[in-house]
């Protein structure tokens, strides 16, 4: 607690966050006319305020801004509109100052807000800016909600293990939470001869770190899953516990609801620029010893509101967690276009993901024992309830430019693989389809997380390349640890920092697991 107070005090003393208040006005309120100055009454009033703050510390307030109906697993669209009269983006409530500004309010950004406010409560003024508060373009909307530990990197395995523990005790964390609809079930990752050895090594590492899965030969796969064609398959890895799928939009809603209850401010708007401040007392020196002049830091974000007006928000710390838009935000901060270290860009682009709901009433169609099946072709498929419905997903290599569905995509790219791997679903009927984007790290397809090496007040949490939803829980906690403690306290994610781009040490994930 002492360290926490020191951190908060440091934030509040910094010149670029001086005057930050919970309402963004910077004023202390002054003496109220007619205020009762009787010492006993004043003492009782202060005691009542303290007791109310103690209660709010342990139980978040129920915000009125998160009354959005949450879809079922087979309904991946918001089934209602927000009451715009209750939005927290009324100009009078705009935060002109804050301690932490989070750019991007999807799964990762809202998780960061939740963890910061869960720890700091009123000690930190946290503002989240989201340009699309309907999440029509969010990667969370086109997430299959998978939870799986079948990765090849220890960091990814540990983050998913934490997510499993958190989801199993979600009510303890979220209180009266929106049901996450978590369905415990294993994932089945299939591999041909060329990747069988890698799958073995990954499985061994996963079990050493606390996951539980087993390796199945082609014969054992056929015996266990008669609907599965094992031609071209040498080995399969089946998760035995701590795996399954959940409703990603429900998780996002809980993050927002709880963070708002703890006092976080969610702003509907788009960051269109930054304002900088030159600090003459700090010089930038290159590795070769040349002086590049005074350090120029980030001071304010220029935010365009839905009505077209532009406002500025002065921050002590800023986090870029804008998913597929992160590279554009980084360029506004001169990352990728500046001198020295700033020449190194944030290697994120928007990739398109296709999702299909299909139905088969065939007697031999997969039933309750069907795991989330991951085919070497890149097709992911799982059942959706018990009525013969299935969710089928594939990440395309095309860059995202719109949510339009290519009418020939399923027939050309997905149905042939279904015929091959699960023949009974080859004739399944497509009952719904949708497309969206996700943030793809073109450097090594892994998240970029941590402090930027140039700016002393900028953090990154982006580029998770398709598995950001299941990692959002651990990522939010990790960023909160860096901000409040100055280091990772639980899972050491330092290898995922931006520094690996500068020294050219990629962190390749061999098992791309969707979430």
UniProtKB/Swiss-Prot annotation:
Disulfide bridge positions per record: none
Keywords assigned by UniProt, alphabetized: Membrane, Mitochondrion, Mitochondrion inner membrane, Oxidoreductase, Transmembrane, Transmembrane helix
Chain intervals for the UniProt region annotation (Disordered): 18-37
Pfam families according to UniProt: DAO
Annotated GO CC locations: cytoplasm; mitochondrial inner membrane; mitochondrion
Domain of life of the source: Eukaryota
Protein name according to UniProt: FAD-dependent oxidoreductase domain-containing protein 1 homolog
Organism expressing this protein natively: Drosophila melanogaster
Organism lineage: Eukaryota, Metazoa, Ecdysozoa, Arthropoda, Hexapoda
Gene that encodes it: l(2)37Bb
């Amino acid at each position: 607690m002492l360290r926490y107070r020191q951190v908060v005090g440091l934030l509040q003393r910094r010149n670029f966050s001086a005057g930050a208040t919970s309402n963004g006005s910077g004023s202390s309120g002054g003496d109220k006319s007619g205020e009762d100055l009787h010492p006993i009454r004043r003492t009782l009033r202060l005691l009542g305020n303290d007791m109310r703050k103690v209660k709010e510390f342990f139980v978040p307030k129920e915000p009125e801004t998160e009354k959005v109906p949450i879809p079922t697993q087979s309904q991946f669209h918001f089934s209602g509109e927000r009451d715009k009269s209750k939005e927290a983006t009324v100009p009078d409530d705009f935060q002109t100052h804050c301690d932490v500004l989070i750019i991007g309010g999807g799964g990762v950004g809202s998780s960061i807000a939740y963890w910061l406010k869960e720890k700091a409560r009123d000690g930190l003024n946290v503002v989240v800016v989201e340009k699309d508060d309907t999440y029509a373009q969010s990667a969370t909307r086109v997430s299959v909600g998978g939870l799986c530990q079948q990765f090849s990197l220890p960091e990814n395995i540990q983050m998913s293990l934490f997510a499993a523990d958190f989801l199993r005790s979600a009510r303890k964390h979220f209180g009266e939470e929106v049901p996450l609809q978590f369905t415990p079930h294993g994932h089945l990752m299939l591999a041909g001869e060329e990747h069988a050895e890698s799958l073995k090594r990954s499985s061994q590492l996963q079990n050493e770190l606390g996951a539980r899965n087993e390796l199945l030969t082609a014969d054992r796969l056929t015996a266990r899953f008669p609907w599965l064609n094992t031609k071209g398959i040498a080995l399969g890895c089946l998760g035995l516990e701590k795996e399954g799928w959940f409703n990603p939009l429900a998780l996002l809603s809980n993050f927002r609801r709880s963070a708002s209850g703890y006092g976080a401010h969610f702003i509907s708007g788009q960051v269109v620029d930054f304002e900088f401040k030159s600090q003459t007392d700090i010089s930038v020196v290159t590795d070769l010893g040349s002086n590049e002049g005074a350090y120029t830091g980030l001071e304010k974000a220029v935010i365009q509101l839905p009505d077209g007006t532009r406002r500025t928000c002065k921050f002590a710390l800023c986090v870029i967690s804008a998913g597929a838009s992160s590279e554009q935000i980084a360029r506004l901060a001169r990352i990728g276009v500046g001198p020295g270290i700033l020449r190194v860009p944030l290697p994120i682009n928007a990739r398109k993901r296709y999702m299909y709901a299909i139905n088969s009433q065939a007697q031999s169609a997969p039933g309750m024992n069907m795991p989330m099946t991951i085919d070497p072709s890149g097709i992911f498929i799982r059942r959706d309830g018990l009525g013969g419905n299935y969710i089928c997903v594939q990440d395309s290599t095309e860059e995202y430019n719109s949510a339009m569905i290519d009418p020939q995509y399923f027939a050309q790219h997905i149905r042939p693989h279904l015929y091959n791997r699960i023949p009974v679903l080859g004739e399944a009927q497509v009952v719904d389809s949708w497309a969206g984007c996700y943030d793809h790290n073109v450097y090594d397809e892994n998240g970029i997380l941590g402090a930027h090496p140039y700016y002393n007040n900028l953090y990154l949490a982006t580029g998770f390349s398709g598995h950001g939803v299941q990692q959002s829980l651990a990522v939010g906690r990790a960023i909160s640890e860096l901000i409040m403690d100055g280091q990772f306290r639980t899972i050491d994610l330092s290898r995922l920092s931006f520094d690996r781009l500068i020294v050219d040490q990629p962190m390749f994930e061999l098992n791309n697991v969707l979430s």
